[in-house]
Amino acid sequence: MGLQNMTLRRFTLSMSALLLLCALLWLWAALEQQESSLAIRPVTPNTSMPDGFSIWHHLDANGIRFKSITPQDDALVIKFESSEQSAAAKEVLDRSLPHGYVIALQEDDAIAPQWLSRLRDAPHRLG
């Protein structure tokens, strides 16, 4: 009876530790994913932005997947799963878009600085 109780307790502790380890690995993997984005801006103010559909067509024709295409301020921002996808998209768009556009790679910030910037109202001033 005592041996069976101790074996059950060890099994329960082992399974709990394994479950905790799996949860930590899953959390770490989720935090490690880093998005990348590409911003397309016209060089001159009187140049219009490229159409999102034509951008989609060029990327799709070359097998490049993306998360979203959204206009943001004076740019068209394309979000990707990885920096490799955005680098490949930059090469494709450099070839296919007419001159007059700046295509810039942008690595998205890490999660911790994003949360910190959301939590604080204004930057702290020392001195």
From Swiss-Prot:
GO molecular function, one term: protein kinase binding
Source organism superkingdom: Bacteria
Membrane topology, Periplasmic segments: 32-127
Key words of the record: Cell inner membrane, Cell membrane, Membrane, Transmembrane, Transmembrane helix
GO cellular component assignments: plasma membrane
Main localization (coarse): membrane
Coiled coil: none
Function, in words: Modulates the activity of the EnvZ/OmpR two-component regulatory system, probably by directly modulating EnvZ enzymatic activity and increasing stability of phosphorylated OmpR.
Listed name of the protein: Modulator protein MzrA
UniProt gene name: mzrA
